[in-house]
A protein has these predicted regions:
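A solvent-exposed, charged loop/short amphipathic helix patch at secondary-structure junctions
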Residues: 191-208
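Metallocofactor- and cofactor-centric catalytic cores in central/energy metabolism, strongly enriched
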Residues: 1-168, 173-176, 185, 198, ...
């Protein structure tokens, strides 16, 4: 509970509290943009309406309701029965949705709970945080596009720690360079001037995709390999040679197989020889690729 200073202190402290433990902040700033302060945590913001400096007929009501709300969250408790054999994280994007949906369907049939994270920056950050909190048994990282945004200054960067949590925690992971053919920007007018002349595609009115080039793919491939080389647990890399997104398949606006090959070759040349690399002459959204990804992660989980 607080005004400006108190709110920032409270929200900062709440970052250390694991997801699932109730968190509520009654604040005069609750109607402001506190995106950065809330971050990836499950924090409930409640407007105080009046200043919290003293008690009055309005503040008494709202403080009582805030106390009731947090008590209600605590009393809700946790599910008593485990409803799945394990939890698997999976990353997705519009360009990899068919793949992720099929993988999810197949894994659910095996009794797993599958949680999808949209690779728009906060999605990757949240997934990494939950992995570190021990929430997941394995990761099917289909869509690693946030690495490209971090490299090129796109709007979907998840920061430098993307693709590190599973490696540090030692849980099984199958990694795919999904959507590393693109960097995300807002409206066409927001694309930095340094990228003028590059291949751009308007995915939506306020979403512009930029095709990654060979030089960027060298950096991305090396970065991915170096992060995976530090894995404490089992990891495999799965490469769809005929397209790493919907728009890079044959006939797609980003179809540049020679540029994708630079990415594949760089990953393979920098990856620890003990880490298996499976190459498939299919697009990322084809059924055989989806089945292979699921088979790999299930085989790891059985060990």
């Amino acid at each position: 509970m607080g005004g400006g200073g108190g709110t920032y202190i409270a929200l900062s402290a709440m970052q250390a509290i694991p997801i699932g433990i109730p968190k509520l902040c009654l604040s005069t700033f609750a109607t402001k943009d506190l995106t950065r302060q809330v971050g990836i945590k499950d924090i409930v913001l409640m407007p105080s309406v009046v200043d919290v400096a003293g008690l009055n007929n309005i503040s008494r009501i709202l403080m009582r309701q805030a106390a009731g709300a947090i008590c209600g969250m605590v009393n809700a408790g946790k599910p008593k029965e485990k409803t799945s054999v394990g939890n698997i994280a999976i990353s997705m994007f519009g360009n990899t949705t068919p793949c992720v949906e099929k993988c999810t369907e197949l894994l659910k049939k095996k009794g797993y709970e599958v949680l999808a994270f949209h690779s728009i920056g906060v999605g990757g950050q949240t997934m990494e945080a939950l992995i570190r909190e021990g929430f997941f048994d394995a990761v099917l990282d289909i869509t690693t596009t946030e690495l490209a945004d971090d490299l090129c200054g796109g709007i979907c960067s998840a920061g430098p720690d993307r693709l590190t949590a599973a490696a540090q925690m030692g849980i099984p992971q199958v990694v795919v360079p999904g959507c590393l053919d693109m960097v995300n920007f807002g409206h066409l007018d927001t694309v930095p001037k340094r990228y003028q002349g590059r291949l751009l595609y308007s995915w939506a009115p306020d979403v512009t995709l930029m095709r990654t080039n060979a030089e960027e793919n060298k950096v991305l491939g090396q970065s991915m390999a170096e992060k995976l080389n530090r894995s404490k647990g089992e990891v495999a890399v799965l490469l769809p040679l005929k397209g790493i997104s919907k728009v890079s398949e044959e006939g797609g606006v980003f179809h540049q197989p020679e540029v994708d090959q630079v990415l594949f070759d760089t990953i393979k040349s920098h990856l620890n020889s003990k880490i298996p690399v499976i190459e498939m002459a299919v697009n990322i959204n084809e059924e055989t690729f989806e089945q292979k990804a699921v088979d790999l992660i299930l085989a790891m989980l059985k060990k």
